[in-house]
Amino acid sequence: MTELNHEFTETLNAAPERVFAAFTDEAQLTSWFAQSADLELREGGAFRFWGRSTWQTPFRWSAHQKVLRLQAPGLLAFSWPLDGLDGLDSEVTLTLVKDEDESAGARTVLKGRHHFPQAPSIDRPLDFVDDLWRIALANLRAYLAGGEVYPPDFSDAAPRVRQAVTIDAPRHKVFHALLNPDALNLWIAAKAVVEPHQEGRYSYGWSYDVRGRTVAGGPTQILEVVENTKLVTDWPDWRGDASRPATRVSWVLEAIGDQTRVTLIHEPFERTTDVSDYPHGWAHFLAGLKQHVESTSTST
């Protein structure tokens, strides 16, 4: 098999020293990246991390990562046997540079490279590694901001996203925000299209670039609709890969007095990494739905 290189750049709202510590302090690393860690911060020292949040490394005895290069607070490189095969190490190199634009406060430009001499022997290896780092970076951003972290669980045979929020408004107002195009455009959509019946069109009007291709992302169709109670839509592959099976997103509304409990369920995913950074994305949109509905309810 051919080699695989995955590169990424992330701007983080923290100084390089703070970000470096998040990777190299055991207590911090286990707060956002892995369940357990055993770190020897020297070249050639152990950089072990393991647990159900680490692919192919559920136990300490299966963790063989090592520090390759270390220069605080700007460089960390470590080996990472990711394929579960002896002798097939991948290598992660992270560089941290202070963002010269100080108008937004202390920030770090994190550049990463994950190199495999041979691509992992799995389906869609590039997508797998990309999603692995989308999960990690989303959790790192949340950790640095004091927000909620959503660690993956590689022991889960049926991975899914489940989020919930309580909105200070009755169900019919929340339901309106899910089915009215003008309302959707205020909190989640760009140019929403809604045919409010089963098998009707349902689009957020999203358009973005993935590896040089333009993708019309988000839902395309209503699968189920129950007035003021439930909305279920399809959710095609976000990278625009038509060969991948679509998932579905369910919005379930429950009346709790004068309030509404909204539960979002996104499923099914074929593998844990396919969940990607959806937990953070859906938490963001649920917060947007709450803010939109409560502000419009107050104004009316």
What function would you assign to each model-found segment?
Residues 5, 79-134, 221-224, 234-283:
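Beta-strand/loop substructures that line and gate deep hydrophobic ligand-binding cavities in soluble
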Residues 7-9, 62-64, 91-93, 162-164, ...:
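Well-ordered beta-strand positions in beta-sheet-rich domains
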Residues 2-11, 15-127:
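Ordered, small/hydrophobic-rich secondary-structure cores
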Residues 1-38, 42, 139-142, 148-193:
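Hydrophobic ligand-binding cavity/cleft-lining segments
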Residues 144-152, 293-300:
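Short alpha-helical interdomain "coupling" segment at the junction between an upstream regulatory sensor module
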Residues 38-82, 193-240:
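Glycine-rich portal/gate segments that line the openings of hydrophobic small-molecule binding cavities
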Residues 137-145, 286-294:
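Short amphipathic alpha-helical signal-transduction/dimerization elements
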Residues 19, 29, 47-49, 67, ...:
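Hydrophobic pocket/interface hotspot
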